Amino acid sequence: MTVSLPQKTTASIRWLAAPTSWTWVEQANARPMEVLIDHAHCERKAAGSAVQMMFRYLCEPGLGEALSPLAREELEHFEQVLGLIKSRGRYLEPLPSPGYAAKLARHIRKGEPQRMLDSFLVAGLIEARSHERMALLAEHSPDSELRSLYGDLLASEARHFGLYWVLVEERFSRAVLIERLQTLALAEVAALQGVLDCPEIVRMHSCGVCPV
């Protein structure tokens, strides 16, 4: 498998080794509020991850200036999604995690600078998958309000995984990046393989990808 190389200024979902399956789209459309609430949790966690990396690499030149605005934007998205949830008579209830991010985290190496490289690439892959699935919902959701919401968020999500690519490209050789991205992209697909046992537990990052 060969992962297409993102451009420095215009990354794309070519980060991903396999596309989302139509089964996931159908499951997500059947349980729109569960996916929406999970999406709010995803935005909250993405903000937390950006802040965590900003403080972990506090003295790394340029990281604070890049990650602080990203974290703020993730929180703005969280508030936007939360507002829609509340307008529909629901609240930010706890939801069981599909384990997607935890599976990816196991592939992050412990020593530096490998830990930094893996952390940024994993964060970028998660953003890329979010972008891809939001694009599917923006096109195929039967709910016009949800189509509008997901469509509005697409440009920001693309910027986010593009930013993570730029951050690693500034710090590592291209050959090292591509080799590691290929490995982690396959791990990302493996984290989404399988069949959802219960349609009620569909999440933004629940299983549902096409074969590699």
Residue ranges and their predicted role:
Residues 2-212:
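Non-heme di-metal
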